[in-house]
A protein has these predicted regions:
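Conserved pre-ATP/AMP-binding loop-to-beta segment of ANL
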Residues: 3-20, 54
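Conserved AMP-binding A3 loop
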Residues: 16-43, 50-52
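AMP-binding/adenylate-forming
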Residues: 33-40, 56-133
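Gly/Ser/Thr-rich phosphate-binding loop
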Residues: 137-194
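Conserved ATP-binding loop and adjacent catalytic segment of the adenylate-forming AMP-binding
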Residues: 171-214, 224-228
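AMP-binding/adenylate-forming core of the ANL superfamily
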Residues: 208-236, 251, 306
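AMP-binding/adenylate-forming catalytic core of the ANL superfamily
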Residues: 232-325
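Conserved C-terminal "lid"/linker of ANL adenylate-forming enzymes
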Residues: 290, 302-304, 316-358
Length: 358
């Protein structure tokens, strides 16, 4: 889907839009969402970040998914000048920017992408991979450093990327988003650079959060979601003091992992994200932790890696992980499966008859 296609859908007489989930934890799903709730979400984000009519925005995410759609809706609702590039791993590269187009929703006319880019972008959204790649190339890093408000979603921010983001000037506000397709993009933000950098997400004023008996985050966001949403994210809540809190309420949260990313192996509970975080500084090749059913252990942890030297990978695991966290199987693949939005695609891995070597 390109911008023209989406605008035709947005401007038709239907009051709903068809969206697709990314499929990072299973098969992608279709769902219909109300345009009015998308408008609400757009206004909430723009108001919080102080985005004004006539400001510039940068679209480098696929319009097939909610993140790209919402970036466009924000531009329409707040009358922004929108620069569009083809979704890719290096959206700030010369090659990508040379093909950029622009639409001025403030004056309802076309405009020069080059002129807007020269002035600097006021608002952009990217996935972690795009940010990481941009920070790795001096010319792209310089351009990234001139984006006034950068929101990062669609995947976890690992320690290495977080450290790089902390080196950006405080004048550039970099945020990690929390949300999903069902909440029409994000319902909470946490700062990634400057003195306010934190691991705690702060919900918007119109959003309330709690945890259920299983420890999963429950979201009450009536402006964007008609019913309370019970997530699969295991969360911890914290009442912030007045100096730390934003807006009208003081409850913040942090995500410890996903309920469906919990491996129960021989009575030991292993959180997939924690294992990956411990290994990431020591494994250079892309990898992921997943699980499979096992007659003896119930479930067992499996490490999937693009590294062909699985003996070395296993050695690192035994050195860096607690004994019962060490994967029981190691598999080589040519490419770690990813969704179109840049998330690791764990769902259905063992149903695809991938040839394994352990």
């Amino acid at each position: 889907m390109d911008l023209k296609d989406f605008l035709e859908i947005w401007e038709n007489e239907e009051d709903r839009v068809l969206v697709h989930t990314s499929g990072s934890t299973g098969k992608p799903k279709e769902m219909w969402v109300e345009k009015d709730k998308m408008r609400n979400s757009a206004r909430i984000t723009c108001d919080f970040l102080g985005i004004q009519s006539g400001d510039s925005a940068f679209l480098c995410l696929p319009l097939d998914y909610i993140a790209g759609k919402m970036m466009t809706v924000r531009s329409i609702e707040r009358e922004l000048r929108l620069v569009c590039v083809e979704p890719c791993g290096h959206p700030l590269s010369n090659e990508a920017l040379q093909q950029a187009t622009a639409v001025d929703f403030h004056t309802s006319s076309s405009c020069s992408a080059a002129t807007i880019l020269a002035e600097g972008i006021d608002f952009a959204a990217m996935v972690p991979m795009q940010v990481f790649n941009s920070l790795s190339v001096p010319e792209e890093r310089e351009r990234l450093g001139r984006i006034k408000n950068l929101i990062i979603g669609g995947g976890a921010i690992d320690e290495a990327l977080a450290a790089k983001l902390m080196t950006l000037p405080e004048e550039i506000a970099v945020w990690s988003t929390y949300g999903m397709t069902e909440t029409l993009s994000h319902i909470a933000l946490r700062r990634l650079n400057g003195p306010d950098a934190s691991e705690w997400y702060h919900p918007f004023d119109s959003v309330k959060v709690e945890v259920n008996q299983e420890g999963c985050l429950v979201i009450d966001a009536p402006l964007v979601c008609a019913e309370k949403l019970v997530t699969n994210d295991i969360a911890e809540l914290k009442v912030m003091d007045t100096s730390e809190s934003w807006g009208s309420h003081r409850v913040a949260f942090r995500i410890k992992g996903r309920k469906d990313f919990l491996i129960c192996s021989g009575g030991v509970k292993i959180q997939i994200e924690e294992v990956e975080d411990k290994l990431r500084p020591f494994l250079q090749s892309p990898f992921m932790i997943t699980k499979k059913k096992d007659e003896k252990f119930g479930e067992m942890a499996v490490l999937v890696s693009e590294d062909v030297d699985l003996d070395e990978v296993e050695r690192v695991c035994k050195e860096q992980l607690p004994k019962f966290w060490v994967p029981k199987q190691f598999i080589h693949v040519d490419k770690i499966p990813m969704t179109e939005t840049g998330k690791v695609k764990r769902g259905g891995f063992f149903e695809k008859n991938i040839t394994c070597c352990s």
